[in-house]
A protein has these predicted regions:
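Active-site-proximal, Lys/Arg-enriched surface segment
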Residues: 1-59, 157-160
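Single, function-defining residue in the core of a domain
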Residues: 5-7, 18, 22-23, 57-253
Length: 253
C-alpha cells in the first residue's frame, strides 16, 4: 500500500469433490457434505472452502482458506475474517461474486475501510425513479435502443454498459452496471450486472477493479489440477486443514 495502489480483498469459495462413502463406513471423511455447485449446476459431495486473498500492486497473497462445516454460515465466516483485517492506508476494495453481495458483508467491510465491488444477480430489485423493478426487467426496457449505453473496453473486449445510481433492497446509493458483450447486446442470457459502493469511480474503473478478482479463480484451478485439492485422501478435519495450509504455501513457491 506504500505505492498508493488500492488493496483488494478477494473472496470466493470452491468445492473439493470427494466420493460419498458407504452408509456402512465406520470412519467417513470428516466435515464432508453435499454442497450446491454453481459450476456443475448440481449437488456435489466434498469439502467446501472459503478463500480470502489480498492483492496490491500485482502482489497476491492467500490470506485465509477456511473449511466450511455448516456450524457457521459463509456470510459469518467472511465477516469474521473482515473484522481481523487491518484498515488499509489507501482507498481499497472488497471483490466478490454475487453470492457474497449482502448488506451485512458490505457494511462490515465498509467499517474496515473497503468499498465493495461485486457481481450482482439479475433478479435483484432496483428503484429507478422510486419505482421497484427487477434488474433484468429494467435492462430489457433500456436495451430497446443503444442510446442509454456506453461502449467500453475491458481487457481488450468491448461491452455495452449502462450505469444506474440509486438504491437496492437493503443497500442505499450504489452504482449498478448493466453489461452486454458488444455482439450480444440485448440478449438476456448475456446480461451481467455489477455493484459498486464507491460512487466516485468511473464505469471503466469499476470494471477494471472487478477483473482483479481473477487470481482467486486461477488459484482454485491450479490447486485442483496441480496440488491435489480434488484428490487428497485425508480423513480428519484437522489433517485436511493442515494439508490446505501446506498447499497454500506450495502454490506460491
Amino acid at each position: 500500500a506504500r505505492t498508493g495502489k488500492p488493496v483488494f480483498c478477494i473472496v470466493d469459495d470452491t468445492i473439493a469433490s470427494k466420493t460419498k462413502p458407504s452408509s456402512r463406513a465406520l470412519h467417513p471423511i470428516e466435515d464432508a457434505y453435499f454442497h450446491q455447485s454453481h459450476l456443475k449446476g448440481k449437488q456435489d459431495y466434498g469439502h467446501q472452502a472459503v478463500s480470502v486473498m489480498l492483492s496490491c500492486n500485482g502482489i497476491v497473497l492467500n490470506y485465509a482458506f477456511v473449511l466450511y462445516n455448516k456450524s457457521i454460515s459463509k456470510i459469518d465466516i467472511v465477516q469474521d475474517i473482515a473484522k481481523e483485517l487491518p484498515v488499509p492506508p489507501v482507498k481499497s476494495y472488497f471483490l466478490c461474486d454475487c453470492w457474497y453481495v449482502s448488506e451485512k458483508i458490505i457494511n462490515t467491510f465498509a467499517v474496515q475501510g473497503f468499498h465493495t465491488i461485486g457481481a450482482l444477480k439479475t433478479n435483484r430489485l432496483l428503484y429507478p425513479s422510486g419505482m421497484k423493478k427487477k434488474l433484468s426487467e429494467l435492462a430489457a426496457e433500456l436495451s430497446v435502443t443503444h442510446k442509454n449505453f456506453d461502449l467500453v473496453t475491458v481487457k481488450g473486449r468491448n461491452y455495452y454498459v449502462y450505469r444506474y445510481e440509486g438504491n437496492l433492497n437493503g443497500i442505499e446509493n450504489a452504482i449498478v452496471l448493466f453489461s452486454y458483450p458488444e455482439k450480444a447486446f440485448g440478449n438476456p442470457k448475456a446480461l451481467r450486472a455489477f455493484l459498486c459502493m464507491d460512487i466516485s469511480l468511473s464505469t471503466n474503473e469499476i470494471l477494471d477493479c472487478y477483473v482483479c478478482r481473477w487470481p482467486i479463480e486461477v488459484f482454485f484451478r491450479q490447486c485442483k489440477d496441480k496440488l491435489a485439492l480434488d484428490s487428497y485422501q485425508i480423513r480428519s478435519a484437522q489433517g485436511i486443514r493442515r494439508y490446505w495450509l501446506i498447499m497454500s504455501f506450495a502454490h506460491y513457491m
